[in-house]
Amino acid sequence: MEPLVLGLDLGTSGVRIAVLDTAGHLLHSSSTSYARGLAHAEDWCRACRELITGIPQTLSNRLRALAVDGTSGTLLACRTDGTPIGRALPYSRACPDQSHLLQALVPATSPAASSSGSLARALELLKRVPEPGFLRHQADWINGWFLQDWRWGEEGNNFRLGWNPQKNEWDGAISNQRWAAALPSIRPSGTVLGRIDNDLAIELNLPTRISVVAGTTDSNAAVLAANPCEADGVTVLGTTLVMKRFTAQPLVGPGITSHRVGGRWLCGGASNAGAGVLRRFFSDDQLRELSRQIDPESASGLDYLPLPDTGERFPVDDPGLMPVLEPRPVSDALFLQGLLEGLATIEARGWQRLRELGAEPPLRVISLGGGARNPQWRRLRERRLGCPVLSCTMPPAAGVARLALQALNEGESAQQH
């Protein structure tokens, strides 16, 4: 029987999985929400367990590899056996009180130098738990759960913790710190970390020979799902707004990520703003109905900065930046248009920021996430960005599954030679 691969996408509000065949066709996809929220690591594996056990047995019996992506920057302190110590600090949690310590640890040009980065959250966790066994990002912790071995970390997920993918070492003085033993052993995206734990495989009704492959971040997985060409930019319109594109060289700057994916540099940034702020005011049904009342060819006249809370990481890195959500007009449709225009402005500034750092401007933008299905928002973005905007319906879970498929194909090729 043809082998299959599994991708698991751990997002802000829940988990989605995707099963692909060797041709990359999507055979199965399902999702569920976290019971309590992103900060609860137990909910991560509970959601994964629920979705995996729901895969039809005719498919699950053929699985040979899996890969996980997670929210970039959500960090957890845990014991060496993986037991969480308190709650995780979500990616959106800035820790400005750690700024002075960051300056002593890493250069100002390091992606880890920002108080909105993972290193700042690590220092905050170390203040609460001075002797953790491990500090692990969301995807790395779930990989540990599958393996029952929490040693490993994938390089992209640890970028803003201070891992330098160009030098293959921790930035600055990080490795000299007393707590450096809590950091993961880094492996490149697409590397086979080991086989799924035998007892867990049986519990999940999975084959015991499944390989666990180092995945990537949730935003990188979305890009892989879009399968862009060199001239394309990719925007993920999820709870947060993520802009990525392939570049000839890595880009460097606060709030900027440069990851190696498929042998190429994938660079970009993620705003704290996104569709999450829309759901604060409207249900999905209301968003659909109100969007139909919007004329995207006419401006609302509103000038919003729709951040969910104080603080931004990209296109500007400012932990003190305040949201602007007023004045609110009487018309809900006009209010929604103002919010969508504000998000489009953030996106335009994001692409401009990447251009300032050396990236070519995208000739078109491929959109993913729930917001990509909104035609009025698409047109508002086209007007603001000045280029065509297309949609991709493949979920990020399918993107990270491509890494599992790549590892599976490389393993078979090596066996043939």
Model-identified regions with their sequence ranges:
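Active-site core segments that coordinate phosphate-bearing ligands/cofactors
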Residues: 6-7, 103-112, 117, 123-137, ...
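Short alpha-helix plus adjacent loop in nuclease-associated cores
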Residues: 89-107
